[in-house]
From Swiss-Prot:
InterPro entries: DtxR_MntR_Metal-Reg, Fe_dep_repressor, Fe_dep_repressor_sf, HTH_DTXR, HTH_tscrpt_reg_MntR, Iron_dep_repressor, WH-like_DNA-bd_sf, WH_DNA-bd_sf
This protein's UniProt keywords: Activator, Cytoplasm, DNA-binding, Manganese, Metal-binding, Repressor, Transcription, Transcription regulation
Protein name: HTH-type transcriptional regulator MntR
Any one GO CC term of the record: cytoplasm
Protein residues bound to Mn(2+) 1: D8, E99, E102, H103
Oligomeric and partner information: Homodimer.
HTH dtxR-type domain boundaries: 1-63
HAMAP family xrefs: HTH_MntR (MF_00732)
Function: Central regulator of manganese homeostasis.
Compartments, record wording: Cytoplasm
Protein family per UniProt: Belongs to the DtxR/MntR family.
Pfam families documented for this protein: Fe_dep_repr_C, Fe_dep_repress
Length: 142
């Protein structure tokens, strides 16, 4: 299993390839706010663990294993963003909160959160009831 740091790199590489068609060491460094030398070290480790194929000065490509993991990690991130949005977390906190929790949840927990998100997507009345429970709204009952 990849470490949380490895997951961050795989997710970012997958995302870059999906949006730009490629991922360069400099792009990854810019996106993750790290030095290119740190990216090179991690890319070499990911190559050794068969998540990608890296050739110095030529770039990198994800292996099927890396592509599958990258897709799953990106979906996990989006799912957690949806969940936090549904439960009323302030949008300005969502990205940071997801970054803080995504590596600490089991895949079983992620699947259950997916069930909750799907439930609220399929039951707008239940979502409306949940939104009405928002503690930040002033109590209008007297």
């Amino acid at each position: 299993m990849p470490t949380p740091s490895m997951e961050d790199y795989i997710e970012k590489i997958y995302s870059l390839i999906e949006t730009k068609g490629y991922a360069r060491v400099s792009d990854i460094a810019d996106e993750l706010f790290v030095h290119p030398s740190s990216v090179t070290k991690m890319v070499q480790k990911l190559d050794k663990d068969e998540y990608l194929i890296y050739e110095k000065y030529r770039g990198l490509i994800l292996t099927p294993k890396g592509t599958q993991m990258g897709k799953r990690l990106l979906e996990r991130h989006a799912l957690l963003e949806s969940f936090l949005s549904i439960i009323g977390v302030d949008p300005s906190h969502i990205y940071h909160d997801v970054e803080g929790i995504e590596h600490h949840l089991s895949w079983n927990s992620i699947d259950r959160i997916g069930d909750v998100v799907q439930f609220f997507e399929n039951h707008p009345d239940a979502l409306k009831t949940l939104k009405e429970m928002d503690p930040t709204k002033p109590d209008t009952k007297e």
